[in-house]
Structures are given as C-alpha cells and as structure tokens.
C-alpha cells in the first residue's frame, strides 16, 4: 500500500511539474506572529526560488473572521497556492500545512514541518500534548496584558538565539500593530481544537520534520509522533534550538530545507 501511494504521488507530480520550471516555496508562520518572522531565514535560501509568505487569517495584515478553525485557515491559504508548491509550516502554520497536504495534495510537492504538532492539547489517548489548563492560562494572560505577554512569548520562542534582543526589537512593533487579543484568542482556540492525527496517513508527499531539542512549547516528542505516523517523513533535531530554529539556527535549517527540496525535485 505504501509503495502504491508513493508511485501515485510521484507520477502526479511528474505530470504537473512539466507546467513549471522554478522552485516555489510557501512559508506559513505560527500563532501570534506574522510573515515577517521569516525575515532571518530568507537570506539563507536560494535566490532563484520563488518565496511566498502570507499572513494567516487573524494575524498580521490579514483580517480575522468571527471564528477560526484549521480548515478555514487552510482553505484561505490553499486557494492562493500554485500547484507544485513546497510548504514550510512552523507551529500553527505546520498544522495548517498538514491540512493542506491532506486535502489539497495537487498543490503540495513537499512538506517541511518545523516545531509543530498533530495535536497540541493533551487527551487520554494523546498524553504527550499540553494540558488544557496551561492553554487557558495563556489565553487569559494575553487578554490581561497583550503587549507584555506577547513580548514574553516572543522571548520564549527565541531562546538560544544570539541576536534575540535585536530580533524582538525588529519583530514586536509589527506584531503589536497588526495583531489583536481577539484574533489571538480565536487562533488559540483553533489550536486547542486541532487534531490532525486522522489525516497523517493521507499525506503522501515527502516530509521533513525540524524540531529544536530545547523546545518547551513543541518538544521533540511531538516530532517523534509525527515521524511515526506520517508515511514518508524524516525527523531532524537541531541542537541548542528552542521553538524557532529557523531563526536561531537559520543557516542550518535552510541547509536541511534546501537539501530536502532538491532531493524531492530530482524525483519528479
């Protein structure tokens, strides 16, 4: 069954690939951030790649609907994707990327999931997740003092980043200007409800998993779960990286990403 899945994906991508010549990469950011979070990564990527980094609904300059769920976020992104796109999803963006890869496979050539999860909230059948009371506490903190706790959240994500203070000074003003507590609350509720586990076996494209070994938000055990349940996945753990390895270890992550994409494109 696995071989048939690979064969089907391979032939479909080969036919579609004839329509394009340039590598197309879409970067999907995480909760409470925006597309500017990828600025430190961009200089390390090949200059001849076409790179698209949209703001998820309710983040950055993208307006927030009355309610958010992963399907809505994914449909919004998928509708703007060209076929044969390489998807890079970080944290919440990684969950959206999983949904797109499962439901819009003709749009996705490869998947790279960075510091993300199949399910964030713990449950009886998923003990590796984060307890609900911690999620609710996070939500209340943001409602209480949005600027203060957004800065603290960003500091946590950028642990072990040498230029952390400079990056926070660059990123935080845009995040405060464009984000709202209401939008973040809706997105956090979408994260709490998200469960991609039933979709993992449907994701046929090659997948690279990148996690930081010091990540407390999405610890490596969440990457190990994905590696065990995705049909064609490789797990890479970046040493001394926390929740944003594409910032703290941008050159190393870019190297892994480029190696992954080049290998996939050689197959098609």
Regions found by a protein language model. Give the residues of each.
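Conserved alpha/beta-hydrolase catalytic His-Asp/Glu region
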Residues: 143-194, 198-199
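Gly/Ala-rich beta-loop-alpha elbow adjacent to hydrolase catalytic centers
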Residues: 89-93, 97
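Flexible "cap/lid" loop of the alpha/beta hydrolase fold
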Residues: 102, 110-142
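Active-site glycine-rich loops that stabilize anionic/oxyanionic intermediates
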Residues: 30-33, 91
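Acidic catalytic loop of the alpha/beta-hydrolase fold
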Residues: 214-218
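Short beta-strand/loop motif that positions the catalytic acidic residue
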Residues: 203, 209-211
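Catalytic histidine-centered segment of alpha/beta-hydrolase-like enzymes
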Residues: 241-254
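Active-site loop/oxyanion-hole signature of alpha/beta-hydrolase fold enzymes
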Residues: 39-43, 52-88, 255
């Amino acid at each position: 069954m696995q071989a048939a899945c690979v064969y089907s994906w391979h032939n479909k991508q080969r036919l579609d690939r004839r329509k394009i010549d340039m590598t197309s990469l879409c970067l999907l950011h995480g909760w409470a951030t925006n597309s500017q979070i990828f600025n430190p990564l961009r200089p390390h990527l090949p200059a001849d790649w076409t790179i698209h980094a949209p703001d998820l609904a309710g983040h950055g300059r993208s307006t927030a609907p009355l309610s958010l769920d992963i399907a809505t976020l994914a449909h919004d992104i998928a509708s703007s994707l060209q076929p044969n796109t390489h998807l890079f999803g970080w944290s919440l963006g990684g969950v959206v990327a999983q949904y797109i890869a499962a439901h819009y496979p003709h749009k996705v050539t490869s998947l790279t999931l960075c510091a993300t999860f199949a399910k964030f909230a713990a449950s009886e059948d998923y003990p590796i997740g984060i307890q609900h009371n911690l999620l609710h506490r996070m939500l209340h903190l943001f409602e209480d003092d949005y600027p203060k706790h957004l800065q603290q959240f960003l500091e946590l994500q950028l642990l072990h980043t040498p230029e952390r203070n400079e990056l926070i000074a660059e990123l935080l003003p845009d995040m405060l200007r464009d984000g709202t507590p209401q939008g973040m609350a809706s997105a956090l509720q979408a994260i709490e409800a998200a469960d991609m586990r039933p979709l993992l076996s449907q994701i046929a494209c090659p997948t690279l998993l990148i996690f930081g070994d010091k990540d407390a938000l999405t610890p490596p055990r969440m990457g190990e779960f994905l590696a065990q349940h995705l049909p064609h996945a490789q797990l890479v753990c970046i040493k001394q990286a926390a929740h944003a390895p594409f910032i703290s270890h941008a050159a190393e992550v870019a190297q892994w990403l480029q190696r992954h994409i080049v290998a996939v494109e050689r197959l098609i």
